[in-house]
Amino acid sequence: MKTDTIAAIATGLSNAGISIVRISGDQAFAVIDKIFQTKSKAKRLSEMDSHTVHYGYIVDEEEIIDEVMVIIMRAPRSYTMEDSIEIDCHGGITVTKKVLEAVLKAGARIAEPGEFTKRAFLNGRIDLSQAEAVIDVIHANNELALKNSMKQLKGNVLHKVKDVRHSIILDTAYIEAALDDPEHISLEGFSDKLRDNVIGSIKELSELINTSENGRMIKEGIRTVILGRPNAGKSSLLNLMVGEERAIVTEIAGTTRDTIEETVFLNGLCLNLIDTAGIRETSDLVEKLGVEKSLKSAKEADLIICVIDASTPLNQDDKEILEFIKDRKAIVLLNKSDLDSVIEEEKINLLTNKPILKISAIDQTGIKDLEQTITEMFFEGNISFNDEIYITNMRHKNALVEAKVSLEQVIVSIENEMPEDFFSIDLMNAYEILGTIIGESVDEDLVNTIFKEFCMGK
């Protein structure tokens, strides 16, 4: 690991109130002493107590660059567990760059992307899953994603994985000890105990794996396709949910010929709304391509909102759409409830078992019922999180699945009365795989790949 002193701008480079230039490494105080000056020219910062804030100026050969506040943190009580300095300067682009240039001129080098967090990981302050949570916190685009990332940052995934690994290593150690010293340590009856322990570990891993689909939707949003025949009111519904005229609305059927995507936030959930071309038989080549794209989007959706014009009788297009959504997560909306309805809910019920709601995109009625129904369809209506952690990282999910497969092989070996050393092979394989999640058994290339995704200064 590189132990030289690094520096970078930790905030977005723009005209703002303040910017932060971060320094970390064993020469951090030597660097700041060269460029920081107080009005009274009092003691150097290297002589000050840790976790204190100091007012003064950043200078370059006696020329004042900026008026700043400097925070000093001595190792190991810092983010990187190294001597660290944070310079709060004015937020202009030019002045921030000049401050960084002074820091580099004084002996620091520019940090690589994610190098501060990488040092926090390599120095043992956080594990690899927590390091990955840092970037998830930064990129979180909704409240639930932020809450889940913070739980991971606090070590929830770490603790669950460590508990399973601890159980595995205890069983492995006992087997190895018994094989080395059979006169004093007996394996008689151990298979039953091992089976119970492994089944418990498989259950723990399965529970984590089963959260990954909801985890994906928390992180990326619920892919929600608005489907229906032309002029059913799909674009009006999109505009209503988005809160602005995002899609063109006319009385001419087939106005929307391509998908339109927008993101809305609903009770902490992120919905990626997709307005699609109306579904109908058509000879128009462009419209036909739009219909095909609509159906493709619907097949990939987490949720389909099927919009039916309640002011006109059901036609064959409506019936085919209802058949299409039969085995998918969907809601049926009877739109244009402001007009006289000619469709009976009982007839719709015969064609689908999906929730049916009345709505008027024009009068903006029924939207609250729609929002409540969507909330209830995901996370069992409970999105307060409590103590649950959702797996949002595909690397973590794949490792959990691989570890589970190895543990299931242990059960197979027990049932087939295989020699005990066979148990150890699969147990240790699961142990090592789980170690890749928290960084206890991971190669350098993977670590470097993960941290390259970070921004400069983090």
Curated annotation (Swiss-Prot):
Pfam families: MMR_HSR1, MnmE_helical, TrmE_N
Binding positions (Mg(2+)): 235, 256
Sequence ranges assigned to domain TrmE-type G in this UniProt record: 221-379
Annotated GTP binding sites: 231-236, 250-256, 275-278
Function field: Exhibits a very high intrinsic GTPase hydrolysis rate. Involved in the addition of a carboxymethylaminomethyl (cmnm) group at the wobble position (U34) of certain tRNAs, forming tRNA-cmnm(5)s(2)U34.
Keyword vocabulary terms for this entry: Cytoplasm, GTP-binding, Hydrolase, Magnesium, Metal-binding, Nucleotide-binding, Potassium, tRNA processing
Organism superkingdom: Bacteria
Higher taxonomy: Bacteria, Bacillati, Bacillota, Clostridia, Lachnospirales
Protein name: tRNA modification GTPase MnmE
